[in-house]
Amino acid sequence: MSEELRCPWSINDPFELEYHDTEWCVPSKDDTYLFEMLNLEGAQAGLSWRLILHKRKAYQEAFFHFDIDKCALLTDDELATIVEEAAIVKNRLKVKAVRTNALATQKVQVEFGSFANYIWGFTNNERIINKWQGMGQVPASTELSEKISKDLKNVVLSLWAP
């Protein structure tokens, strides 16, 4: 991808560049990937996305590549070990949230058929393409992000904010 087509935030770091060129704005209906993004965004709260991208491999290793069913079965002892030993952000609440989110995601899968069906249902399976001219125009949240956040909280997903 040519540099003029890249977002300015992506060009100074190889992890952000790879993420930008292969994942940013690429629609996904893969439950495992969406579950990973949910949890990485939760881990990022109060921190930088760059930091989380640099620790992403460690997160994937610690959480079975975000296998929802395996994450739902994590014990308190296993979660404590992850906090102590894994090369991730050392926040017990954020680590515990992965199991909580997995359990909630399983409930969503039963009700909606998949986590992707649930998430994409907010947009009637349509992509939203914004036409921001610069980073200064991008809002911290939107009416839709607020709605999704509220609904996610209602299904017990923790540490999630728009």
Label each region the model flagged.
Residues 1-162:
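HhH-family (HhH-GPD) DNA N-glycosylase catalytic core used in base-excision repair
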